[in-house]
């Protein structure tokens, strides 16, 4: 399939799924492709995830800057059972994200399935498409489980 048509399909699916993020990403990539600014693709391939993660982390941490929390409240929260669960979830999420990044670097063709799964999740389950790395990480874990079961 021609990459231009693929990007157009992704953009249209993003529009149908009401995913502004997917529409903007698709349109930007389509524009970059049409204007033959190929070095942008190389840059995004090499640094895009890192830059995106920096902005994501800044967005999350900015809430602490806007409404500072007392140190005692932070300590009480971290030492509660909910805080412990949150810490474990953070550890698992970062591990899964790392596994997902490895999977996508080794087998980039899986991104198509992740995009399709994300679209199904958005359209039918009201999901939010913010975690392709997490989706790939869950896929990597499921692949390992299936490999173990199959022997």
Swiss-Prot record:
This is UPF0756 membrane protein Hore_21770. The chain crosses the membrane at residues 7-29, 49-69, 84-104, 110-130, 131-151. It is found in: Cell membrane. HAMAP family: UPF0756. The keyword Nucleotide-binding does not apply. InterPro entries: UPF0756_TM. It is a multi-pass membrane protein. Keywords: Cell membrane, Membrane, Transmembrane, Transmembrane helix. It comes from the Bacteria. Belongs to the UPF0756 family. Its main location: membrane. PANTHER family: UPF0756 MEMBRANE PROTEIN YEAL. It comes from Halothermothrix orenii (strain H 168 / OCM 544 / DSM 9562). GO terms for cellular component: plasma membrane. Disulfide bonds: none annotated. The keyword Membrane applies.
